[in-house]
Amino acid sequence: MLLKRHIRLRTRIPLMVAALLTMSAVLVPQPATAADDKKVLTVAVSQSVDSLSPFLASRLVSTSIHRLMYEYLTNYDPKDAHAVPGLATKWTPSADKLTWTYTIRSGTKWSDGKPVTAEDASWTFNKMMTDENAATANGSFVSNFKKVTAPSPTELVIELNKPQATMAALDVPIVPKHIWEKVKDFSKFNNDKEFPIVGNGPFVLTGYKADSYVRLEPNKSFWRGAPKFDELLFKYYKDGDAAVAALQKGEVSFVGDLTPAQASALQSQQDIKVNDAPGRRFYALATNPGAQAANGDKFGNGDASLLDQRVRQALFMAVDRTTLVDRVFQGHAVEGEGYIPPRFSTYYWKPSANQEIAYDPAKAGRLLDQAGYKKNGDGKRVGKDGKPIDYRILCHATDPEDKAVGQYLKEWWADLGIGVTLDCLDNVSDPWLAGDYDLAFDGWSVNPDPDFVLSIHTCGALPATPDDVGATDNFICDKTYDKLYAQQLAEYDAAKRADIVKKMESRLYDLGYMNVMAYPNAVEAYRTDQIQSITTMPEEAGNIFGQDGYWSWWSAVPAASGSGSDDSSASTGVVVGIVAGVVLLVGAGVFFGLRRRATAEDRE
């Protein structure tokens, strides 16, 4: 079978790739020196920027860049992720905890020289409260706000309708009022036409070309101190092999989302350090619950059989997560259970032995029989319409793990009598938002405070109408879940709140619309002859890319031996191609296995 042939190839990939990458490194050594001796830190990325507007962006690459451009009221400490000052130096609740007063840092300026004041924060939040388009990305943080005012340049007051536990973790970029008040339509403004973009974070965005590069320069007046590199460049590589080759040649400083084969090959490379740390993401299989809008209108074309909870549980019962971790992730992941990764121990939940949907294909078959989806004479499960069931799984065309997992699902579910069609696209957003899928590979990065990733499964996150775009991830709308969400948001006692969050995870698990298969590690690499030191988050066994803060790129110290990567190609928007020798040597099957994960999920 194709699947088994693919598996055998993957078991040989690490040795073959190691030899190929080593050969390419020997054949094409390159100095890591820019023409003008600027210290340039170049980060290879594969995920496209969805928007440079912090009011619209949801993808990881975009939100990571926004953390560099704009200050938030608070930040997360890189050691243990507790709340630390950001734009606000302190925050104090009233006795009833319905009014929060923030002291705004005095003496700081926007990159155009104008002072940063509490009025900027007040305007940002009020805009989100009064314009649904401005609430697209982060509206859940302000949905409980009653009133926001700025009595003085250094005082921000937020009044709440009900207690809200996230007041020290409002992950909302504060923007300059004098710039953004000129925007007429927040749904269409992507903040990508005029440069430099005015901000107050550690970096100033000075250049951007879609699917080519994002260029940032140090904010010399940043209150924590200016970054030490002269330039930070996010350079786009659609192909993971090209990014790895560029790292070897010194054309980039950092590459993330490495495949196990790439990580293994790079371990022995001179001047390259591989970082393999527990990740902050989950990798899941989302099931279409019947796409709907907040006004009650139904849309999309999800298979009706998936509305039966027994069917959803049977499908997940036929997923061998141990095999996925061992064969697809090759040990660089942990088996999935609850919604929140084990890295966040306070909120990590796992099902009891009686609740767990363990791998049991025989039991899955019996469950489908009980649900009325029995096999016909050809061994195919038949739906209520009398037709054989064939599920479409939406996957990312640039993601080899989606494809590899999809092949396993094809084999496992075929044994159940269920067909699978992998619908692998460069752009999964359009069919997803339209509800035109049966199942989909899904994943999100989780923040130290999990409120946001919890909020995207509430009824309030649904689009207003089928023509609108909501904050929902998968159109889930469950009253029991919503009730628990409201309870956790209003609970200030940390232990009690964690217990409620775990009940929410239990509810999601039982519903079967969000089946977590794995928690992938953050596997990444950087050149030590370009980067002398860099902060991971958490500092012990943490990741570099996609942090809950700006710590990595802000803290990075240039290596004394080099001047950073050569950014000459990015200045003209040219994307470096893959090393020709590697293309010629790597066959189609090996090439597929070599490719790294091209995205941390497009919807992240």
Language-model region placement:
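Short, solvent-exposed loop/turn elements at domain surfaces
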Residues: 50-56, 81-84, 166-169, 214-215, ...
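Short Gly/Pro-enriched turn/cap motifs at secondary-structure boundaries
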Residues: 63-64, 80-83, 192-198, 204-209, ...
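Extracytoplasmic
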Residues: 36-40, 47, 68, 86-88, ...
